[in-house]
Amino acid sequence: MKKIVVVCGPTAAGKSQLGMHLAQHLGVPVLSADSRQVYREFDIGTAKPTREEQRRVEHCLIDVAWPTEHFNVARYRELADAEIDRLTRQGKPALLVGGSGLYLRAVSGGLEPPAVPPDPALRARLAVERLDALYQRLQQLDPESAGRIHPNDQVRIERALEVCLTTGQPLSAQRRLRARDFSLLALGVGSGREALVRRIEQRTHRMIEAGWLEEVEYLRAKYGPDLPLLSTLGYAELGAYLEERWDLAEALQQIVVHTRQFAKRQMTWFRAEPDVHWLDESAGRQTLEQQSIEQVERFLAG
């Protein structure tokens, strides 16, 4: 039977570091479960593993689409299933690491995404509307999905509306459970509120030092400021700075505030998942890593 280990939790909690530690211990690649890391060139702002980290540990399911491509949870599940099958044939477990709840749930036996193909004409009509107007429309048509999607996430807002308007039913009502043909261990990496805020602030400044602002300038010049991905968390705030609507200090503060809000929504999502085993991060990184290895070894031996 297939065996899948999931490492999940809010942004900046330390999932990636733990995932790499487990990958090295198990001798398997990290299968990323991040809805923005799938896109090429969106690197620093998505906290994509660096080249050095990718040399140390193989990462799959990153850089699989261009920023102008349509990519959704159904396509992600297709790619993830192929990687899981490949690892199973090699007698190895799959290690999924990320904070995109929909991606993780679709792969781990939760949601079966509705098979609604893209509608270019409908997308063109939606693209000319203001993002806040689209979000308000989604709140009316599908309040459950709207509650799970950030108001700045244009890609997911447009997709949810596309499904609603194409089928006449809310996206949230069309998801169904898929049958499990594997065993699953889900490990949650959380953090206390103050510690998480501190990590978010530190990570934001590290990203700026690593060249995030230059990345945004490059992407805006190459694809134009209206590229939907440039309206997502962090890229939108730095775009406002480049347009001289905020100074840099205000842009960074807004990134921290919005990231905290996003992390809170992620925690709400993952806390509602019944099968997640939460690790005690307050015991320190070394203890956390040892706890995770012990749980994984028991799971694989079972």
Swiss-Prot record:
EC category name: transferase
Segments of this protein annotated with the region Interaction with substrate tRNA: 34-37
Site for Interaction with substrate tRNA, residues: 100
Residues that bind ATP: 9-16
Protein's UniProt keywords contain tRNA processing: yes
Cofactor(s) named in the record: Mg(2+)
GO molecular function: ATP binding; tRNA dimethylallyltransferase activity
GO process annotations (BP): tRNA modification
Record EC number: 2.5.1.75
Record's keyword annotation contains Signal: no
SUPFAM superfamilies: P-loop containing nucleoside triphosphate hydrolases (SSF52540)
InterPro entries the UniProt entry points to: Dimethylallyltransferase, IPT, P-loop_NTPase
Binding annotation for substrate: 11-16
Catalytic activity line of the entry: adenosine(37) in tRNA + dimethylallyl diphosphate = N(6)-dimethylallyladenosine(37) in tRNA + diphosphate
Keywords per UniProt: ATP-binding, Magnesium, Nucleotide-binding, Transferase, tRNA processing
Self-association state and partner proteins as the record states: Monomer.
Similarity section: Belongs to the IPP transferase family.
Purpose: Catalyzes the transfer of a dimethylallyl group onto the adenine at position 37 in tRNAs that read codons beginning with uridine, leading to the formation of N6-(dimethylallyl)adenosine (i(6)A).
Official protein name in the record: tRNA dimethylallyltransferase
Provenance organism: Gloeobacter violaceus (strain ATCC 29082 / PCC 7421)
